């Protein structure tokens, strides 16, 4: 069946356990031997060579191997990312690699073998802390939701218990922040805070000054001041609040898709292409198209019925 599918396939993607594709005859060399135009993409934890080639990998484990967990969390505890960043990183590089190979095939007629390692994909995303550590001599400190090297940059609570994040990028913004947001212009010339390096050094004193002001304001009032001063900021939303985010609604980013359990909302793909409407066809149940696909592949009704009786489909 796989052979029949491959006869009309442009791309074959697999992320089976290490060595499984080869044992099944689905490795790139075997598949492309009679199909030089085929694009084969192998996704694995650590790649097909090297001492880790046979090592199993899951998202959290790769986060740990890539050093991400070591720099994420608080001073007292390392934590993982709450989304599957290693899986997503590998998937995105597989996606871009396949598109590149398809474009090249249009010009050359030749397929390609693509290898994507979860570790290598996440290592690419770890570029800043990796080079900061390699050439700066020490890794970025775990600082919770704060920025490790910029202050103030992180979360602050209002009198209503809500949280706002803000970040300053230069000294002009620092002066405006003191004058217009905190309404404490004397802090702009306080020697403890006269540069970003000083503000990081005296982070706790700085945050105490900010909290003394923000503790008397609700988050809406804080955001209003930040917006007026043109200081970057964001409200800390819950996932439920994200689902009802006014910006997503204003840009009409939600679509309704039909399913067997009724209509569900789904977001549009992030890349918006002028003149192209994303397809949101009804989502079929598992196995809903099995018969039509097998018929398309040339299997007789008798064979399909036998497979169904044997529980194969």
Question: Can you say where each PLM-predicted feature lies in the sequence?
Answer:
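Aromatic-enriched alpha-helical interface/lid elements that frame and gate functional surfaces
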Residues: 152-229, 233
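Non-transmembrane alpha-helical segments in soluble domains
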Residues: 3-6, 99, 174-179, 211, ...
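Active-site-adjacent "lid/gating" segments in soluble enzymes
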Residues: 22-168, 176
């Amino acid at each position: 069946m796989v052979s029949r599918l491959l006869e009309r396939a442009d791309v074959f993607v697999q992320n089976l356990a290490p060595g499984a594709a080869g044992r099944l005859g689905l490795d790139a060399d075997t598949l492309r031997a009679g199909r030089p135009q085929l694009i084969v993409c192998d996704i694995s934890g650590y790649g097909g060579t090297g001492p880790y080639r046979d090592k199993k990998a899951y998202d959290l484990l790769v986060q740990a191997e890539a050093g991400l967990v070591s720099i994420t969390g608080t001073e007292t505890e390392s934590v993982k990312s709450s989304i599957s960043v290693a899986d997503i990183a590998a998937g995105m590089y597989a996606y871009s690699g396949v598109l590149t190979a398809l474009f090249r095939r249009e010009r050359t007629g030749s397929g390609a073998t693509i290898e994507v390692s979860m570790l290598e994909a996440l290592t690419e995303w770890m570029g800043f802390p990796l080079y900061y550590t390699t050439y700066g001599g020490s890794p970025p400190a775990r600082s919770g939701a704060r920025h490790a090297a910029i202050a103030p940059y992180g979360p602050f609570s209002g009198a209503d218990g809500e949280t706002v994040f803000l970040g300053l990028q230069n000294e002009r913004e620092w002066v405006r922040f003191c004058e217009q947001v905190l309404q404490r212009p004397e802090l702009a010339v306080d020697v403890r805070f006269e540069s970003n390096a000083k503000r990081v050094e005296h982070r706790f004193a700085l945050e105490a000054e900010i909290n003394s002001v923000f503790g008397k304001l609700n988050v809406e009032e804080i955001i209003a001041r930040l917006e007026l001063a043109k200081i970057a900021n964001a409200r800390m939303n819950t996932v439920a609040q994200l689902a009802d985010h006014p910006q997503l609604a204003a840009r009409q980013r939600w679509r309704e898709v039909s399913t067997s359990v009724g209509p569900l909302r789904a977001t549009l793909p992030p890349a918006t292409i002028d003149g192209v409407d994303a397809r949101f066809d009804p989502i079929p149940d598992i196995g809903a198209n099995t018969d039509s696909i097998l018929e398309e592949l040339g299997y007789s009704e008798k064979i399909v019925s036998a497979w169904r009786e044997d529980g194969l489909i």
